[in-house]
């Protein structure tokens, strides 16, 4: 406790985190893209290479997952305006939200119904390609739908994949790995929903369950993989490959906005609100957005009051050297995808200069907004996916932040507020009814 008091003396906001208060922190260390980019350790070329790899796999994905065929084997989500929800939020919070609110429906991505379909699937495909190229079974000029043949399934069945997850990452990696032909084991934390485990098992995935939180599941997955040279461990805490799979979203969104005739420039700023667990998904997406829109996009991470690992790590500068449990927070939240006590040190250090801020919200707020969105827009999400929905009203109320960035009333009126909906498209009906019943 004495250590917590010392920490609070240096970092006063920790007191609010410990008290589980809904907190907003605007990052005083935010820099321009030019200044912040070198610290990421990855470049636009890396993201372009990821884009090209996904294009090589498109013919395979279109055949393996017919639901992607219409999009030519591309796994991408719609971006939609939510004017009724915007009005509802203004009414509930008594706060005008200048500009227009949009929803990015990663919640309804093909194959696994969450943002993790981006990074998780990309890393499995990257590994499969590497093995097939090294074995001389494939060249990058081939039509990758040959990977569906029995010979390839046989080849991949010699190899296995392991991952630790609170649910959605396991779902995307499990489904994709099983489809390729890998043997796959998903190490699930106590937070993982029963339906996610059942769905994985239905695909022939081995699910190992733990009574502990996310960190333990990842550690056990890493250990199990070390003893088997043919087992590849997908490391949610440190993976650059996962990060790049998420980053592709930036260029894709830019293209979607261009199609819709939506302008993003200095006088039409873009604010993006990303739910954050360990950090890979929102970190990768934010990196991609920065490459696509430069200094005209402003990214915020959103976390549950019971799991504010990234806010704690970035705000104190301690990154993965501190966990929420170290300051007496239990890491128990209904937002199962965000129930992470220790943030990725890689993502925190890579992105700390490129984030405009982080905020927390409590479970009840997520449930309330889940209900409002279902009522107003007929869109149903899981609790984690509502974390971003609290962002626009916080930003519009933050006069000091607006002044620091020199936003005029005109700029704010022209702003786009994009809420990144991270999951919920595959939640079973009975489970969704339980969520809806908890909203006020």
UniProtKB/Swiss-Prot annotation:
It comes from the Bacteria. The keyword Lyase applies. Its cofactor is pyridoxal 5'-phosphate. One of its GO terms (biological process) is D-serine catabolic process. GO terms for molecular function: D-serine ammonia-lyase activity; hydro-lyase activity; pyridoxal phosphate binding. PROSITE patterns: DEHYDRATASE_SER_THR. It catalyses: D-serine = pyruvate + NH4(+). Disulfide bonds: none annotated. Its EC number is 4.3.1.18. The keyword Protein transport does not apply. Gene3D superfamilies: 3.40.50.1100. The modification N6-(pyridoxal phosphate)lysine is found at residue 116. InterPro entries: D_Ser_am_lyase, Ser/Thr_Dehydratase, Ser/Thr_deHydtase_PyrdxlP-BS, TrpB-like_PALP, TrpB-like_PALP_sf. Pfam families: PALP. Keywords: Lyase, Pyridoxal phosphate. Belongs to the serine/threonine dehydratase family. DsdA subfamily. Monomer. NCBIfam families: D_Ser_am_lyase, PRK02991.1. This is D-serine dehydratase. It comes from Salmonella agona (strain SL483). The gene is dsdA.
């Amino acid at each position: 406790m004495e250590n917590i008091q010392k920490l609070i003396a240096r970092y006063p906001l920790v007191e609010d985190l410990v008290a589980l208060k809904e907190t907003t922190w605007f990052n005083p260390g935010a820099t321009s893209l030019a200044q912040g980019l070198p610290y990421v350790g990855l470049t636009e070329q890396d993201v372009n290479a990821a884009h090209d790899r996904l294009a090589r796999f498109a013919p395979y994905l279109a055949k393996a997952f017919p639901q992607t065929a219409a999009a030519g084997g591309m796994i991408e989500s719609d971006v939609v305006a939510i004017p009724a929800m915007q009005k509802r939020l203004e009414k509930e919070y008594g706060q005008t939200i200048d500009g227009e609110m949009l929803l990015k429906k990663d919640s309804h991505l093909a194959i696994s119904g969450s943002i993790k379909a981006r990074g998780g699937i990309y890393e499995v495909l990257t590994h499969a390609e590497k093995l097939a190229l090294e074995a001389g079974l494939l060249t990058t000029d081939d039509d990758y739908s040959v990977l569906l043949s029995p010979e390839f399934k046989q080849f991949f069945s010699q190899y296995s994949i392991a991952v630790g997850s609170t649910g959605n990452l396991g779902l995307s990696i499990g489904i994709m790995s099983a489809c390729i032909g890998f043997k796959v084991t998903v190490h699930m934390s106590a937070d993982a929903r029963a339906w996610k485990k059942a769905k994985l098992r239905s695909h022939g995935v081995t699910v190992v369950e733990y009574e502990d939180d996310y960190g333990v599941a990842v550690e056990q997955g890493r250990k199990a993989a070390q003893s088997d040279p043919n087992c590849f461990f997908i490391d949610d805490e440190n993976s650059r490959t996962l990060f790049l799979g998420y980053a592709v979203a930036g260029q894709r969104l830019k293209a979607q906005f261009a199609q819709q005739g939506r302008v993003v420039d200095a006088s039409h700023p873009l604010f993006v609100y990303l739910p954050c667990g360990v950090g890979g998904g929102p970190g990768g997406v934010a990196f991609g957005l920065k490459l696509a829109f430069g200094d005209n996009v402003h990214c915020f991470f959103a976390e549950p009051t019971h799991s504010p690992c990234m806010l704690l790590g970035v705000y104190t500068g301690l990154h993965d050297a501190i966990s929420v449990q170290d300051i007496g927070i239990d890491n128990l939240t209904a937002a199962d995808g965000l129930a992470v006590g220790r943030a990725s040190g890689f993502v925190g250090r890579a992105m700390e200069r490129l984030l405009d801020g982080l905020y927390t919200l409590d479970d009840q707020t997520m449930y309330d907004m889940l209900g409002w969105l279902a009522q107003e827009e007929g869109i149903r999400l899981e609790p984690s996916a509502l974390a971003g929905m609290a962002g626009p009203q916080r930003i519009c109320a933050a006069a000091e932040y607006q002044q620091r960035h020199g936003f005029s009333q005109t700029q704010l009126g022209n702003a786009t507020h994009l809420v990144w909906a991270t999951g919920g498209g595959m939640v079973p009906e009975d489970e969704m009814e339980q969520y809806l019943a908890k909203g006020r």
